[in-house]
Each structure stands twice: as C-alpha cells, then as structure tokens.
C-alpha cells in the first residue's frame, strides 16, 4: 500500500516531515497507508483521531494528492507506520481493535494516552492484519476463549506479521512486553488491547499504597451504597473527590454503533459502551479518574446514549454516557484510571438481568442508570446531584 497523507478542512495545512499535532484544525484528515485520520481536538490536550477507509473518503472527496505516510510520536507527526504511531505515542497505556460491524468487516482501533485519545477505523479488505512485514516486532499476544458464563484467557508470543484472528469471535489480542497483569482474565471479546508495561506502572503508581486503587474514591462509596443500607442515624461517607454532571436520557443505538470517544474533562460523569463492556468513571480537578468496567457476554448488544446538553457548558460540549443492556458475565471491575492508565483493583458484584427483547433491554438500562444515579446523589451535596428528565423518573 502506498503511503499518503492528505489534509481536508477549512484551513489547509502545509505538511512538513514533522508537524505538531496541536496545529491541526479539528476537521482535517490525514491519509496514512490508505487510511485517513481525522484529528479532532477535545479540550486543550486531548485529540480525537478517527481513521476512515480510503474508499469511504474518496466517495466524498475524489481530489487528493499522495504524499507520504506518517506516524504520531510524542505529539509529533513523523514518517513511519500507523501502527508504529499507536505503539510509540508517548506513555501509551492501551489500545483496542474491535470488530464493530461484521457485515462489512470493519474494525475500530482505540488508543488512550495521557494527552491524546485516538480512534482508528480500519477496513479488513484494505489492510491484511497478518501481512505487516515492516513491523516484525516480538509482542506477547493474548487470545480469548470464552463462553457466556465465564471468560478464560491464554498468552503466547508471536511476531506482528504472525497475528491470526480467531474465526468465531474475530478476536485479536496482544500485550506490550512486561505485561502489567499477566494473570488478568478480563479481556472483552472481539478486542485487541495493548497493556502498559511494569516500568510505566512503577513510574505512576501511588507511592503510599503502591496501587492505583483509591479506597475512598466516589465510585467506591456509590457502588457500596447501591448494595447496602446505612444503619439508622448513620450518614454515608462523603468522598474526597466529587464529580458533577447533569445527565439526560437520549435514546437507543444498535450494536453496530461506532464507539463514541470519552470526553476526559474535569467534573464530569460518563459511562461509555465499547462492544462487550462499559466503562463508568469520574475525573476530579487534578485529572484523577475513578472507573468501573463491566464485562458482558458475546451476545448482541443494544446501547443507550445519555448526554449532558451543550447548554450546561457550551465550552465543553456534550459528555457522552452509554449504558449496555445485556447481562454481565463476570461482574464489575473497579479501577482507577489516572491520565489514561488502567489497572484492575477489585471486583464489585453488580449484575443486570438478562434481556429477551429490546423493551426489556431498555428497562434494564434505565433501572441501572437510576440505581447508579440514586446512589451517586446519596453521597454528594445536593448542588452536585444528577438531574433526571421525565424519561428516567
């Protein structure tokens, strides 16, 4: 495949061999190895990069000029490979390759780093994942074997050009060297994840507890509240960090939805659906995030999107909240995410009932959102409470 890079947008950019990402306007598109990256700034240091297939872009813009392929490294765009970009971006924590539309064999790659969020959409017919000879790097690979009742995993080391899909689940998984959680059995179906290294964990772990887990995080109090009733006369412990959000119920989206990016802005509460699991988290003013991750079976999913209206804070835009409707397969993983880092800290037993149809799915989603918000409101000051529209009352 030829390496090309093309910008589209209101402000054309003269591309040199190295370009600062921060200078790229939101609607610009970079073509890399027959894929196009759409870079969308989110807040001051967060970027969204969306890669479309070249054919999709040619349908809307037939006039493009092949130039050269690039990589993104430490906030710069340089010559190289798009997958090198994902591996080498500064202090990367993980990325995910997820089949979101089996009918068109279209994949989504997501990468979260301390300063940037990258979403990449690849078309299987244009890029053969098993034919990346230019990389030839040894990486530990985790492939998932699973049922609807439990998830088992295994690891092996292969070359990039030896990565093979699992026919049934379309799952491709690999780790960076020195995987932080070699025994971690939490791996969603149809996903490829790059985990942070032990060195990265050592640099960022909490010095006092040698852990990312914060036992007094707001979600710890919230989730405990959902499963227990305080003794009469007792008041729930107020967390040291309290998020703020106004949540509105918006509607349903089918399972083939393209994953929405997370808006990592302070003082917000979000739930994001990504294929077989959801993440629910809060970020404090210092950038520390408490996160709950739910793991689901590989059955079809329906998603509910809930957003805060732009009128709440026009400068920040909408904050996305997505709740999945299928039953949990092995409970909830409670994690603390700090500047893009993931580490399992413990499990909480909270499950949704199985859903036989869309109506039940909608009902279960609503029940979960209401239960969470009710618990949330019980541990925060009234001025920080989540406000419900009539659909959730």
From Swiss-Prot:
Q: What is this protein called?
A: Putative outer capsid protein VP9
- Localization annotation: Virion
Q: Can you supply one Gene Ontology CC term for this chain's record? A: virion component
Q: Which UniProt keywords apply?
A: Virion
- The scientific name of the source species is Micromonas pusilla reovirus (isolate Netherlands/2005)
Superkingdom per UniProt: Viruses
């Amino acid at each position: 495949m030829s390496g090309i890079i093309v910008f589209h947008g209101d402000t054309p950019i003269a591309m040199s061999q190295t370009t600062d990402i921060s200078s790229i306007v939101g609607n610009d598109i970079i073509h890399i190895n027959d894929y196009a990256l759409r870079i969308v700034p989110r807040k001051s240091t967060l970027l969204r990069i969306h890669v479309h297939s070249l054919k999709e872009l040619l349908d809307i813009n037939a006039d493009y000029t092949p130039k050269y392929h690039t990589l993104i490294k430490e906030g710069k765009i340089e010559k190289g490979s798009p997958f090198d970009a994902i591996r080498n971006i500064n202090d990367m924590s993980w990325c995910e390759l997820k089949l979101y539309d089996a009918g068109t064999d279209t994949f989504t790659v997501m990468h979260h780093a301390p300063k940037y969020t990258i979403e990449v959409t690849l078309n299987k017919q244009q890029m053969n994942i098993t034919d990346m000879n230019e990389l030839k790097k040894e990486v530990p690979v985790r492939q998932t074997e699973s049922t609807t009742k439990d998830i088992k995993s295994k690891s092996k080391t292969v070359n990039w050009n030896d990565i093979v899909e699992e026919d049934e689940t379309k799952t491709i998984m690999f780790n960076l060297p020195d995987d932080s959680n070699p025994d971690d059995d939490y791996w969603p179906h149809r996903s490829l994840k790059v985990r942070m290294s032990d060195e990265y964990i050592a640099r960022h772990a909490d010095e006092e507890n040698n852990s990312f887990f914060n036992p007094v995080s707001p979600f710890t109090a919230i989730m405990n509240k959902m499963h227990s009733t305080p003794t009469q006369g007792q008041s729930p412990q107020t967390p040291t960090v309290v998020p703020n959000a106004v949540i509105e119920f918006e509607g349903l989206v089918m399972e083939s939805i393209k994953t929405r990016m997370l808006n990592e802005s302070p003082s917000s509460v979000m739930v994001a659906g990504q294929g077989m699991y959801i993440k629910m988290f809060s970020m404090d003013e210092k950038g520390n995030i408490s996160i709950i991750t739910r793991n689901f079976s590989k059955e079809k999913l329906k998603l509910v999107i809930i957003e805060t209206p732009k009128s709440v804070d026009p400068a920040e835009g909408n904050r996305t909240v997505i709740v999945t409707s299928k039953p949990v397969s092995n409970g909830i993983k409670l994690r603390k995410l700090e500047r893009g880092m993931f580490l399992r800290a413990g499990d909480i037993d909270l499950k949704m009932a199985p859903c036989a149809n869309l109506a039940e799915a909608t009902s279960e989603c609503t029940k979960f959102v209401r239960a969470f918000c009710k618990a949330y409101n019980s541990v925060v000051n009234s001025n920080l409470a989540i406000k419900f529209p009539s659909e959730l009352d």
